[in-house]
């Protein structure tokens, strides 16, 4: 399991311009991530997803996020997420640890 505090810093630096995590948070360029774990791709209510995201059909969890966050466009070709990814596995683990906590509150 990663370091939640390090993960929060990564989220603020690399994710927060496009995503929120709190319950009831608004969608930005990307969807609000509250309730992410256990949700299928393309299912955040009120967000306009690409067909690629809606049709991927996986459920978000530690393993799927670990792979997705390394290279989003490779994992879901056709996603509108413009983020290049996080190459370092430890940084992805930290971010996932933070997301697991922050999106469940």
Curated annotation (Swiss-Prot):
Species annotation: Columba livia (Rock dove)
UniProt KW Electron transport keyword: yes
Family annotation (InterPro entries): Cyt_c-like_dom, Cyt_c-like_dom_sf, Cyt_c_1A/1B
Protein's UniProt keywords contain Heme: yes
Gene name linked to the record: CYC
Localization of this protein: Mitochondrion intermembrane space
Name this protein carries in UniProt: Cytochrome c
Keywords from the UniProt entry: Acetylation, Electron transport, Heme, Iron, Metal-binding, Mitochondrion, Respiratory chain, Transport
Function: Electron carrier protein. The oxidized form of the cytochrome c heme group can accept an electron from the heme group of the cytochrome c1 subunit of cytochrome reductase. Cytochrome c then transfers this electron to the cytochrome oxidase complex, the final protein carrier in the mitochondrial electron-transport chain.
